[in-house]
């Protein structure tokens, strides 16, 4: 599924072990956890602020949670995603949301990656937890595990304060995800939940929304279709 590491990871030298990822036919049979499902219970050791900490789904009760999976530490697309989400963690927190990144690596691998400088392909200091799923149970419960390779695909789940999945995406390995889009969708669900109106395509905070109903929706359609 992927080739062996070209060079061994050395903890004392900031050298990145190169990992080559390829796609699998197993992706065709993946069934990521969809909207309206209850988030599975999870618990594991994460790297938080440069140390090990056990975290679980219970830590996020009453909060919005962005839970995203990535294939492997010390790869190429993955650090760009994790750094992008980590660098904007406070934007999520301002909306009452937390972000957790998870892969099937060990917490020791996560720590080595955090301790590797970004200029060498590492993560550097992180403002979000990196959860270790070494036994692959978490990825499997969320439906993003490729059992042939033991990798998790790029699944992302937006979970509301009641523990209900509201939004799911799952990318094939070569393409990373958008922080801007995740924030947009989070704000849209929060607006809809609060106001009871629905959000049309490409909705942003300054965009009109729709009052659901045959008659009431015409206010929106008349406004945007002049």
Curated annotation (Swiss-Prot):
Enzyme Commission number, as recorded: 1.11.1.24
Oligomer and partners: Homodimer; disulfide-linked, upon oxidation.
Remarks, miscellaneous: The active site is a conserved redox-active cysteine residue, the peroxidatic cysteine (C(P)), which makes the nucleophilic attack on the peroxide substrate. The peroxide oxidizes the C(P)-SH to cysteine sulfenic acid (C(P)-SOH), which then reacts with another cysteine residue, the resolving cysteine (C(R)), to form a disulfide bridge. The disulfide is subsequently reduced by an appropriate electron donor to complete the catalytic cycle. In this typical 2-Cys peroxiredoxin, C(R) is provided by the other dimeric subunit to form an intersubunit disulfide.
Annotated keywords: Antioxidant, Disulfide bond, Oxidoreductase, Peroxidase, Redox-active center
UniProt cross-references to Pfam families, sorted A to Z: 1-cysPrx_C (PF10417), AhpC-TSA (PF00578)
InterPro entries: AhpC/TSA, Peroxiredoxin, Peroxiredoxin_AhpC-typ, Peroxiredoxin_C, Thioredoxin-like_sf, Thioredoxin_domain
Function, in words: Thiol-specific peroxidase that catalyzes the reduction of hydrogen peroxide and organic hydroperoxides to water and alcohols, respectively. Plays a role in cell protection against oxidative stress by detoxifying peroxides and as sensor of hydrogen peroxide-mediated signaling events.
Name the UniProt record assigns to this protein: Probable peroxiredoxin prdx-3
């Amino acid at each position: 599924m992927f080739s062996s590491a070209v060079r061994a990871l050395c903890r004392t030298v900031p050298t990145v072990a190169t990992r080559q990822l390829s796609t699998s036919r197993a992706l065709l049979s993946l069934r990521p956890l969809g909207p309206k499902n209850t988030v599975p219970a999870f618990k594991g050791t994460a790297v938080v602020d440069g140390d090990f900490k056990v975290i679980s789904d219970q830590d996020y009760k009453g909060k919005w949670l962005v839970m995203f999976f990535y294939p492997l530490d010390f790869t190429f697309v993955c650090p760009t995603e994790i750094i992008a989400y980590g660098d904007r963690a406070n934007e999520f927190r301002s909306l009452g949301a937390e972000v957790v990144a998870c892969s099937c690596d060990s917490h020791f691998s996560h720590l080595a990656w955090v301790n590797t400088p970004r200029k060498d392909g590492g993560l550097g200091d992180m403002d979000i937890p990196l959860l270790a799923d070494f036994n692959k149970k978490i990825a499997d419960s969320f439906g993003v595990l490729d059992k042939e390779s033991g990798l998790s695909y790029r699944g992302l789940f937006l979970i509301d304060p009641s523990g209900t999945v509201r939004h799911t995406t799952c990318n094939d390995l070569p393409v990373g995800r958008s922080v801007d889009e995740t924030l947009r969708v989070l704000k849209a669900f929060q607006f809809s939940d609060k106001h009871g109106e629905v959000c049309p395509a490409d909705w942003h905070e300054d965009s009109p929304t729709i009052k659901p109903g045959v008659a009431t929706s015409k206010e929106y359609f008349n406004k945007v279709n002049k």
